[in-house]
Structures are given as structure tokens and as C-alpha cells.
Amino acid sequence: MTTVKKSALMNAEEREDQEDEMLTDETQLVTFKVDKEEYGVHIMQVQEIIRLAAITRVPRAPSFVEGIMDLRGKVLPVVDLRKRFLLPAKEHSENSRVVVVNIDDMTLGLIVDAISEVMRLPNSAIEGPPRIIAGIDSRFLKGIGRLDKRLLILLDLDKIFSAEEVFGMNQVAGGME
């Protein structure tokens, strides 16, 4: 199958998933933990979840960029969400994972403490973002999801990084291939 056909097929599947969500009034999320909080991102932005592997540090990279890693022959910039959210540092554990996401036509990895689950959340259970949550900039948030006694912080991946930061991470990855 050609790349064009694959791309068209993926776009058709993406539209189908979005239409399904509109019809079912649910949002499908990948949820994970960073520090003591549980976060969620839209499943359509997640490419895959991998184990934390060797990371190569890059000189003069932004402080929240942990470095780069090899993902099947491609250079993957890796961001530590703890650093991005100005949370206390913690050693990575066997539960630590890298959530590989697509943001603005760029693929990057997000280090998280643990994966919780893939879930469907009713849109009626999602509230707008509060002004501040434990030091996290409210611009990073799409909202708060309530499910039973759980609160999920729903991240807006398109706003977690400025255009300049995305450009810088692209340069880090592009310059290393």
C-alpha cells in the first residue's frame, strides 16, 4: 500500500472515529499518571505507548526536553512532563512509559509515571478548565473529566508547547537524523 493510500485510509479512519464520538457523545482517552495526578489525552493524538529506553541528552535543549531516543530508526524528541509541569523530580520506575504523540505534524514522546487505561468518557462528564491546577498553566488544559470519584485532567497537547518550542524540538530531532 502506498504512503498516499495509507494516509487517506488513516484520515478516513480518523474522521470515522470523530463521527462515532459525536454520535455516542463520548470521548476516548488514554489516561496516565504524573506525580499524584491522573491525566488524559485524546486517543487520536496517541501513536503508541512504549517502555522507557535509553535517552541521549542534547546540549542546549529546553530544560523539559529529556533528550532523544531511537524509535525504529527515527529520532524521537522526549519530554519529561514532570519538568514541563514544574513538578518535583523523581527517578523513573519500571512503570514509567513514553506516550508517543503527534502534535502539529511532529512526533514526540512524553515521559509519564504510569499508564492508567484507555477509556471512554461521556462528554457530559467534562467540565471547562479551572484557572489553576497545582501550578499547571490552564492554557495546557482542555478540561476536567469526572468519572465516579476520579478527576482526570484533560490535556490540550496542541497548547502544551509554544510554536517556538515545537520548532526547537523539530530542530533537535531533525538535526540528529
Protein language model annotation of sequence segments:
Residues 1-177:
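An acidic, low-aromatic, low-complexity terminal/linker signal
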